[in-house]
Structure formats: structure tokens, C-alpha cells
Swiss-Prot record:
Mn(2+) 1 binds at D257, H339, E384, E423. Mn(2+) 2 binds at D246, D257, E423. This is Xaa-Pro dipeptidase. The gene is pepQ. Disulfide bonds: none annotated.
Length: 443
């Protein structure tokens, strides 16, 4: 495999080319990309955890340092002002020397407010990309050039096509997340609480809870019916029935996002349903290819959900086609089949049909689908179907013409298990689909 340094060199060349094109299209001279700043909690002197500007970490794997600035023009070596204060109160990251620093000019910035004297004097035609517009105004950036929509749309669109460097980083993030999932399953099998399972996960991945790319979903029993459950009970339930873990990891700023579901017992209806959802997820991935709309795969999985609802006699006396047509599958899988993945967990440009930002919304029937694009080589996506037993979604179906088709007794028996979700991260290639998650033998 090529070294990360050589992959990064090519990555920078790609970003430079995209920058040249964007600057030419929008008649700008350069982009000033801000890592961000710390913001204090209201009426307090403690800051919120720092989250770096994703457009900044696209260029450099600097994810924990605020007050950094990057100047890029698509021609000259990118120039990074790296915040390096004299500070005995807080940890100060040293000036980086790593695989990537040969391709970026790194300059120490001793004072956060010192950037103004270091930038080019003529700034009227520089675009600012960052989270603090007032800082850009103070630096003399034109208001119309602060986070210009056309530039951001352009950069977001092409972020969908991962470079080989980005894919290498994402494969490393997968390894970390897989380690965490294995440790979490072991903790579940030993009877730990959600809180303690989460600690086991973080320890195995080498992350703090502020470093993971999203809040871990560690859901035992009926908590698995809450799609984004993040409470973390300190006490283990008296009876362990099920465990849904949706948790990721980050490497050089790139995310992994995996979900697995386990049954405490191997010989009940729920365990068989977990196996069947897993099998159908793999079967769907086996059909995926470039040139097909992601929406089509979402719709196809509703047909697979219908098959499972019929097989497990959760819905009875109705054809699979009629289930999908009348949206009886909807309350059981209320979210989309997945989303784009990269520098952000829900990565950008999911609805963009071109580099001008043309928007194609999700189908009205499936409003929570996060991706409506045609699959193309270089795209990275999650595939995360599920079946859940959520009373607020099932309640409207308890009356009306379709109520008789719901096996309410079976549904009540499954509700204490919460739900099921299986999620892998896949890369679209020209002639195949790479499943980064299964390649690491995570069952």
C-alpha cells in the first residue's frame, strides 16, 4: 500500500485543483479557512468542546486546535498559521511535524488575534470559510465573501468523491470502531450497564466521549426503539434482552459509523429477526453498483422489510407489494437506508445533483432519506436498515382498515426488545462495492 505521505500529496493536489476551479468560477483570489474558536458556556468561563471546521480538516489533519488559519489559492503551497501560544494554564499542541507537513507551509501563530498582521494586505477578494463571520469582518473580508454559498456548494459537491488518502483514513477509522464494537459486545454479554459498556467502547477505540464523531448510541432492551438514544443508564436492567450499539470512531478527521444489534438469547423470535435483517442488509449491498440512484436502494429495502414482516407474521394476510404501497413498512423503518459519510458523519451534499448545488429532495413518502444522488465511484455511504417497535409510530395503525393486518400480540411481545439496526460503511468503486466494515470480519 502507498504510504500516507504519498497519498496525502495526491490529496492536496486534488484539493488545489478544486480550489483553482472554484476561485475562477467565483472570481476570488484565495480562500481563508478558519479552524474555529472556543466558545464559553453562557455565564461561565469554561468552553464547549472544540469541534473543528470540516472544511479546514479536509486540508490538514488538525482537529483539536482552535485559532488556526489556512490560506489556499490553488497554486502556491497551502499556508497554515498554527496556533502556538505561550500558555501555562492549558495544554499547547507543538508545531506539527508529520507525514503531511512537507506539503503545507506551517507557521507558528503565538497570539490568536495576531493573524491580521500576517495576511496579505489586499483582502477584498479573499473568501472566508469558517464559523466566526465577525472575525472575518474584523480582518477586512468583504461581507459578500464570507462563507459564499456558491463556493461552499462547489466544495461540498466534490467532497462526495473521496481521494485515496481519505479512503485510507476511513479504513483506519473502521478498524478503531470495529475494536470498540467487539469490546462493547463482550461488556454486554458480561451484564454491564449502558454507561459501563460505553466506557469499554471508548477505551477500546482510544477515544474520549468528546472525540467520537457523534454521541454513542448504547441502547439496551426497549431503549433500542429510540433512534438516537444517548442517555446511558448507570444501572443494568434486571433482564438483558437486546443490545443495539451505534458508535463510530475518527482518524485524521474522518469518521466511521457502525451499528450492530445483539440478542441476549440465541433461540427466540427476536434473535432470528436480527439474523434476517443482517442477511437482507448484506443481500442489498450485494446488488449495489455505480450508476443507480440511492433512492432506489432505499425503496428496495422497504420491499425486503415487507418480506420479513410477512415471514415473522408481524403483518398478516397482505402481499408484500401492498405493504409497501400502503406504507405499512413505514412505522417499522422510519429512517432512511443511510447517508453519506466522510469528514462529517452525516456528510454534505446528499441532495446536490451538480456542483451548482441543484437540490433534489427526498421522496415525499420517505422524507428522512438523506441522500438522493446517483451512486458514483469514490462515494462513501452507510447502509443501515432497521426494524423497530415504536409505539408512537404504531399507534395510528391500531385503528382503521389496516389494523387487522398487524399481529398486535406479536408486536407487544417484541416491543421489550426495542428494535434492530445493522450498519456497514461502503465505498462505491467503478466495478464493485467495497464493504469496509465486513472486510474487518465484524459479523
Amino acid at each position: 500500500m502507498e504510504s500516507l505521505a504519498s497519498l496525502y500529496k495526491n490529496h492536496i493536489a486534488t484539493l488545489q485543483e478544486r480550489t483553482r476551479d472554484a476561485l475562477a468560477r467565483f472570481k476570488l483570489d484565495a480562500l481563508l479557512i478558519h479552524s474555529g474558536e472556543l466558545f464559553n458556556v453562557f455565564l461561565d468561563d469554561h468552553p464547549y468542546p472544540f469541534k473543528v471546521n470540516p472544511q479546514f480538516k479536509a486540508w490538514v489533519p488538525v482537529t483539536q486546535v482552535p485559532n488556526c488559519w489556512l490560506l489556499v489559492d490553488g497554486v502556491n503551497k497551502p499556508k497554515l498559521w498554527f496556533y502556538l501560544p505561550v500558555d501555562y494554564w492549558h495544554n499547547v499542541e507543538p508545531l506539527p511535524t508529520s507525514f503531511w507537513t512537507e506539503d503545507v507551509e506551517v507557521i507558528a501563530l503565538p497570539k490568536a488575534d495576531g493573524i491580521g498582521s500576517l495576511l496579505p494586505a489586499a483582502r477584498g477578494n479573499i473568501g472566508y470559510i469558517g464559523p466566526v463571520p465577525e472575525r472575518a469582518l474584523q480582518l477586512g473580508i468583504e461581507a459578500s465573501n464570507i462563507n459564499p454559498k456558491g463556493v461552499i456548494d462547489y466544495l461540498h459537491y466534490y467532497r462526495s468523491f473521496k481521494t485515496e488518502y481519505e479512503l485510507a483514513c476511513m479504513r483506519e477509522a473502521q478498524k478503531m470502531a470495529v475494536n470498540g464494537h467487539r469490546a462493547a459486545e463482550e461488556a454486554f454479554r458480561s451484564g454491564m450497564s449502558e454507561f459501563d459498556i460505553n466506557i469499554a467502547y471508548l477505551t477500546a477505540t482510544g477515544h474520549r466521549d468528546t472525540d467520537v464523531p457523534y454521541s454513542n448510541i448504547v441502547a439496551l432492551n426497549e431503549h433500542a426503539a429510540v433512534l438516537h438514544y444517548t442517555k446511558l443508564d448507570h444501572q443494568a436492567p434486571e433482564e438483558m434482552r437486546s443490545f443495539l450499539l451505534d458508535a463510530g470512531a475518527e482518524y485524521n478527521g474522518y469518521a466511521a459509523d457502525l451499528t450492530r444489534t445483539w440478542s441476549a438469547k440465541s433461540d427466540n423470535d427476536y434473535a432470528q429477526l436480527v439474523k434476517d435483517v443482517n442477511d437482507e442488509q448484506l443481500a442489498l449491498i450485494a446488488t449495489m453498483k455505480a450508476g443507480v440512484s440511492y433512492v432506489d436502494y432505499h425503496i428496495q429495502f422497504h420491499q425486503r422489510i415487507a418480506k420479513l414482516l410477512r415471514k415473522h407474521q408481524i403483518i398478516t394476510d397482505m402481499s408484500e407489494e401492498a405493504m409497501v404501497e400502503n406504507d405499512l413498512t413505514g412505522p417499522f423503518m422510519p429512517h432512511g437506508i443511510g447517508h453519506p459519510l466522510g469528514l462529517q458523519v452525516h456528510d454534505v451534499a446528499g441532495f446536490m445533483q451538480d456542483d451548482s448545488g441543484t437540490h433534489l429532495a427526498a421522496p415525499a413518502k420517505y422524507p428522512y432519506l438523506r441522500y438522493t444522488r446517483i451512486l458514483q465511484p469514490g462515494m462513501v455511504l452507510t447502509i443501515e436498515p432497521g426494524i423497530y417497535f415504536i409505539e408512537s409510530l404504531l399507534a395510528p395503525w391500531r385503528e382503521g382498515q389496516f389494523s387487522k393486518h398487524f399481529n398486535w400480540q406479536k408486536i407487544e411481545a417484541l416491543k421489550p426488545f426495542g428494535g434492530i439496526r445493522i450498519e456497514d460503511n461502503v465505498v462505491i468503486h467503478e466495478n464493485n462495492v467495497e464493504n469496509m466494515t465486513r472486510d474487518l470480519k465484524l459479523a
